[in-house]
Amino acid sequence: MNGESKRIVLGVQYDGTPWQGWQTQLNGLTVQDRLEFALSKFTLQTVSTVCAGRTDAGVHGLEQVVHFDTTLERDMSSWVRGVNTFLPPSIAVRWATEVAHNPDEQDNFHARFSARSRMYQYVLYNNPVRSPLLEGKAGWVFRKLDVERMRTAAQHLLGEHDFSTFRSVQCQAKSPVKSMYSIKIEQRGDLIMFTLHANAFLHHMVRNIVGSLIYVGNGAQQPDWLKELLDGRDRKFAAPTFMPDGLYLAKIDYDPKWQLPQLEVQNFLWS
C-alpha cells in the first residue's frame, strides 16, 4: 500500500572490487546503479539515492549510509530482505530505518550533509611476497615498514589543516580545509591497519596520505616530511596515490537524534 512520502535510510556494505566506484555512470557498473536497480525492482518505483561518501573504483564499504524517499509502505526488515533479493553477492543492505521527514522543513536527515564525521580504514599487507588471497582486499608493500616512524609522521596531520597536498586534481570540494580527529596505525603480523577519522575527506586524500606515510615507513623520508608536505600545499611533492585495494569506508557518524542503528562493524581482515 502506498501513502505519504517517507525517508528511508539504509546501511549498505559492499566489496568494491568488481565496481567502478559508487557514483552512477553511463555504463551502469557502479554500486549506486546496482542498488537503485534493486530498489526499483523491489518498490516498482524509480528510486534515487543519496550516499554519505562516494567511493572510487576498487574501494570497499563496511557501512555506507544511503537515504531515499518513497511512498511505499513496508516494515524495515522487508526493506533489508526484499532489496537484498535483487542485489549481487558483492553488495548487501545490512539495516534499514525510517527517519522523520517533512519536505517543507530544512532540518531533515540527509545522508551526506547530516554526517558529523567519517572514518576510513586502509589495510596494508607488508611482506616480501604478495598474497593472492588478499588481492583486491589489502594494499601490498614488499619493503619492511617501520610503524613507529609512520605514527610519528601522522601526528603532523592532526587538527584543522589545508590538505591541498593530499587532494587529487579532480577533487571538487569547495574547500581543502578539513579537521583530522585521529590517525591510528596498528600492526598484526604482516598486516598494518591505518584508521583515519575526520569531519570529511578530499578526493584521494586517504590514499595520498597512506602513500606518503609509506615513504616514511620504508626510510625514504623522515617523519617531519609530512609537515613539510602539509605546509607546502602542493600535490606534486607528495608520494603517488596509493592503490585502492585496501581502502574501506568504515563508519559515518551522525547526531544520536536521528536514532540510526548502531551496529558493530569490523573489518573482516582485522577481526
Swiss-Prot record:
Q: Which GO terms describe its biological process?
A: tRNA pseudouridine synthesis
Q: Does the keyword ATP-binding apply?
A: no
Q: Is tRNA processing a UniProt keyword of this protein?
A: yes
List the active site: 56
Short name of any one Pfam family annotated for the protein: PseudoU_synth_1
* Reactions catalysed, as given in the entry: uridine(38/39/40) in tRNA = pseudouridine(38/39/40) in tRNA
Its EC number(s): 5.4.99.12
Q: Which residues bind substrate?
A: 120
* MF annotations from Gene Ontology: RNA binding; tRNA pseudouridine(38-40) synthase activity
Give the record's keywords alphabetically.
Isomerase, tRNA processing
Looking up Gene3D superfamilies in the UniProt record yields:
Pseudouridine synthase I, catalytic domain, C-terminal subdomain, Pseudouridine synthase I, catalytic domain, N-terminal subdomain
| Functional description taken from the UniProt entry | Formation of pseudouridine at positions 38, 39 and 40 in the anticodon stem and loop of transfer RNAs.
> Family per UniProt?
Belongs to the tRNA pseudouridine synthase TruA family.
Its assembly, as annotated, is: Homodimer.
The entry's protein name is tRNA pseudouridine synthase A
Q: Which organism is it from?
A: Janthinobacterium sp. (strain Marseille) (Minibacterium massiliensis)
Gene giving rise to this polypeptide: truA
